[in-house]
Structure formats: C-alpha cells, structure tokens
C-alpha cells in the first residue's frame, strides 16, 4: 500500500506590466472533473462537486483561500498549463496515470508562485477510519507486480 506525489512549484515572472492575476490554468483534455474541497486539511467528501475545467481558471490569491484546488483526473493522461496572454511564458505539466492533481499557492500570505502537484495518493477524507489499508486513494501493489506512472514538465520562455 502506498501513495506518492510530486510538489513542483513555479515562480511567476511578475513586473510592473504583469501581475499574478494575469496568469491562468488550462487543462487538457477539456472535460468536467470532480473537484474535492478541503476542510481542516481533510477531503470534504460530502461537498465534492462536478467542476468545469474546460475554460480558463484565473489565478488570484483568493482562489486558494480554502487551500488547494483538488481535481480527480481518473488516471488519464492530462496536461495542466500555466500561462498568461501578456507574454509567451508558459509551463505544461503532463501527468501519466495520475488520479489526482492539486493546484496550490500560499494563503493568506501571498507569493508569486503556484504549485501543480500530480498525486497518486491523497489526503485523508473527513470520514477516515485512520487505517492505512482503508485509506481512500491509496495504491495497492500485488507481489511481483509493478507500478508505472509519471509526470513531466516543459518550460516555454517569455520572449
């Protein structure tokens, strides 16, 4: 039984002509995804919802006031992009076989970075038993079997 995840964080180039609020996320494939809110650091399972990720998700400090945005990816290959219209800077995070992604930035203190975190495991649900073998989102690997997953990141300059 195991869970694993990445924690890549990205500094947002900001200056007098561009602010954190000029950036946005896009996802591919464009489809509705289950969004799982957090309450007191636990997955608020009863309040999960179907969220549209087929349009731009604008970045603001307030976007993260309730902690990370967590989406179920259903293990498909996905691309989460961080970009702006103010220059050609963008980052693509490609996930392979990840069931979840967390998108996060510091709050209430603010910073000019965001994290795009592919996860093969997840925080406890608010109805957790506390037993690892019953934990939601864990990976179970039979003897002699293998687990294959990954993510990659591509960076594109602002010029």
Provide a role label for each language-model segment.
Residues 1-5:
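Short, hydrophobic/aromatic beta-strand segments
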Residues 7, 116, 144:
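A residue-level signal for conserved active-site and pocket-lining positions in enzyme catalytic cores
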Residues 9-96:
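Active-site/ligand-binding surface loops and adjacent short beta/alpha elements
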Residues 11, 28, 152-158:
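Solvent-exposed residues in well-ordered beta-strands and their adjoining turns
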Residues 24, 79-81, 115, 148-152:
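Beta-strand secondary-structure signal
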Residues 83-127:
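Glycine-rich active-site loops that engage anionic ligands at enzyme catalytic sites
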Residues 131-138:
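Short alpha-helix capping/helix-loop boundary micro-motifs
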Residues 139-157:
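Short Pro-Gly-centered flexible turn/kink motifs
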């Amino acid at each position: 039984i195991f869970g694993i995840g990445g924690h890549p964080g990205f500094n947002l180039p900001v200056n007098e002509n561009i602010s954190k609020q000029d950036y946005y996320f896009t996802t591919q494939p464009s489809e509705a995804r289950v969004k799982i809110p957090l309450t007191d650091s636990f997955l608020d399972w009863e309040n999960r919802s179907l969220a549209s990720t087929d349009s731009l998700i604008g970045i603001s400090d307030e976007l993260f006031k309730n902690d990370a945005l967590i989406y179920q990816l259903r293990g498909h290959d996905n691309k989460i992009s961080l970009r702006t219209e103010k220059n050609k800077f963008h980052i693509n995070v490609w996930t392979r076989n990840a069931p979840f992604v967390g998108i996060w930035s510091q709050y209430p203190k603010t910073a000019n970075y965001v994290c795009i975190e592919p996860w093969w495991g997840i925080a406890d649900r608010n109805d957790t038993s506390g037993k690892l073998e019953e934990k939601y989102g864990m990976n179970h690997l039979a003897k002699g079997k293998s687990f294959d997953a990954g993510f990659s990141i591509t960076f594109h300059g602002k010029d």
